[in-house]
């Protein structure tokens, strides 16, 4: 007869406290573009300067984006060597894939190295790896390649997430929370890496959604380490606690945001009413998440909202009557990097905790105790993660 019960085994396997973010790292390519110069560059390299009306429309898109600069892996030299990437609908998937299956894990590795450095623990302590990208797809996946590049243990437990889009930053936190809280001692390395070579193409009068993508998206990678029961004796210190996580599909939103992999690469599709769909439905997610905590004033929480574009942030602010400073971290990230899809929210988390410390705020969450992290993406899918900040002076 066994000396222990299943219940005893399960109890021993589970962590005592909540999952926490223990470290954050980010990385971007070296190639930086000023947004003000991008329309001239884009129409020149795609040999589309004769499309003067469309160029004016694109210039207005770039001006309204509120983006100052973006980092892009694709250089003019890349495009000269592969001119079919500059055509609107030319077969080019193989060229894109050959580049991305190498570069996506490499950029992710750089962000992970920075997170591991901040964490200060040997990488042999990493028990799980979650890798997320919408830029490429391969077998074995980018998770395998990144684990090899980092020199992680062969026994590290890997999760590979492909083709999720802009809500994925919330999703990876939800998965990491479940892993960390149900596996005592687990240390989960999250890596989100995006390179827009998958969607770069010339302009078309028939597909203005393509121009929206060209005006908004940037390249970048972010990484966080998640674990429960931080070990203060070795210097582990939480940055945020993960309290709850939820996902929902918004009503009447089929086709609002979509991406399709074709012979011409990844095509991007967007309905005009995306900001309205999100702003009209977001309060339901907030009520479900914060009613158990006793919070119903959305100005009393800190905000980490995926910046799909300025219109989304504007309409959420207006609908919920938020003070302008609530979206400060999201707007700052959008301005400095553009929309980096799944990698974006962790740049914002990083900005939030750094600014809180710099400005002498009492907590990592802009001086507030509770906050919400939101991801918005294809579906239309919304991820909601409730965060609990920690004191900055500990």
From Swiss-Prot:
Listed SUPFAM superfamilies: Thiolase-like (SSF53901)
Catalytic reaction(s) noted: 3-methylbutanoyl-CoA + 3 malonyl-CoA + 3 H(+) = phlorisovalerophenone + 3 CO2 + 4 CoA; (E)-4-coumaroyl-CoA + 3 malonyl-CoA + 3 H(+) = 2',4,4',6'-tetrahydroxychalcone + 3 CO2 + 4 CoA
Name of one Pfam family that matches: Chal_sti_synt_C
Tissue distribution: Expressed in lupulin gland. Present at low levels in leaves but accumulates in cones.
Pathway: Secondary metabolite biosynthesis
Record-level GO BP terms: polyketide biosynthetic process
EC number: 2.3.1.156, 2.3.1.74
GO molecular function terms attached to this record: naringenin-chalcone synthase activity; phloroisovalerophenone synthase activity
pH dependence: Optimum pH is 7.
Annotated catalytic residues: 166
Keywords for this protein: Acyltransferase, Transferase
InterPro entries (alphabetical): Chalcone/stilbene_synt_C, Chalcone/stilbene_synt_N, Chalcone/stilbene_synthase_AS, Polyketide_synthase_type-III, Thiolase-like
Note: Expression level is directly related with bitter (alpha) acids content, thus influencing the bitter taste of beer, cv. Symphony and cv. Ember having highest levels.
Family assignment from sequence similarity: Belongs to the thiolase-like superfamily. Chalcone/stilbene synthases family.
Assembly, per entry: Homodimer.
Role description: Involved in the biosynthesis of prenylated phenolics natural products which contribute to the bitter taste of beer and display broad biological activities. Polyketide synthase that can use 3-methylbutanoyl-CoA (isovaleryl-CoA) and 2-methylpropanoyl-CoA (isobutyryl-CoA) as substrates to produce phlorisovalerophenone (PIVP) and phlorisobutyrophenone (2-methyl-1-(2,4,6-trihydroxyphenyl)propan-1-one), respectively, intermediates in the biosynthesis of the bitter acids (alpha and beta) acids.
Stated name of the protein: Phloroisovalerophenone synthase
Species this protein is from: Humulus lupulus (European hop)
């Amino acid at each position: 007869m066994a000396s222990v019960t299943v219940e005893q085994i399960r109890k021993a396997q589970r962590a005592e406290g909540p999952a926490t973010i223990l470290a954050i790292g980010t990385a971007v390519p070296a190639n930086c573009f000023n947004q003000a110069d991008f329309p001239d560059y884009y129409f020149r390299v795609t040999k589309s300067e004769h499309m003067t009306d469309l160029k004016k429309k694109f210039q207005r898109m770039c001006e309204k984006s509120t983006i100052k600069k973006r980092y892009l892996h694709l250089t003019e030299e890349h495009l000269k060597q592969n001119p079919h990437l500059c055509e609107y609908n030319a077969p080019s998937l193989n060229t894109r894939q050959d580049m991305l299956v190498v570069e996506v894990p490499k950029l992710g590795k750089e962000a992970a190295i920075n997170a591991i450095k901040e964490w200060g623990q040997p990488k042999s302590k990493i028990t799980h790896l979650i890798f997320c990208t919408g830029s490429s797809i391969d077998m074995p996946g980018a998770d395998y390649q990144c684990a090899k590049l980092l020199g992680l243990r062969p026994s590290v437990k890997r999760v590979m997430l492909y083709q999720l889009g802009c809500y994925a930053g919330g999703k990876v936190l939800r998965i990491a929370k479940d892993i960390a809280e149900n596996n005592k001692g687990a240390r989960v390395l999250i890596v989100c890496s995006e390179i827009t070579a998958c969607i770069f193409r010339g302009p078309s009068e028939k597909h203005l959604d393509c121009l929206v993508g060209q005006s908004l998206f940037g390249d970048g990678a972010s990484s966080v380490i998640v674990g429960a029961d931080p070990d203060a004796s070795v210097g582990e210190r939480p940055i945020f606690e993960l309290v709850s996580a939820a996902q929902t599909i918004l009503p009447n939103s089929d086709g609002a945001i979509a991406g399709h992999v074709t012979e011409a690469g990844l095509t991007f599709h967007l309905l005009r009413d995306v900001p309205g769909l999100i702003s009209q439905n977001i309060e339901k997610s907030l009520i479900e998440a914060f009613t158990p905590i006793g919070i119903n004033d959305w100005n009393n929480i800190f905000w980490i909202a995926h910046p799909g574009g300025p219109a989304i942030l504007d309409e959420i602010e207006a609908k919920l009557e938020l003070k302008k400073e609530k979206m400060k971290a999201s707007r700052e990230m959008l301005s400095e990097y553009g929309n980096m899809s799944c990698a974006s929210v962790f740049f914002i988390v990083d900005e939030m905790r750094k600014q809180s410390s710099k400005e002498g705020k009492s907590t990592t969450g802009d001086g507030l105790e509770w906050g919400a992290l939101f991801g918005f993406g294809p579906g239309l899918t919304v991820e909601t993660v409730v965060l609990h900040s920690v004191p900055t002076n500990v």
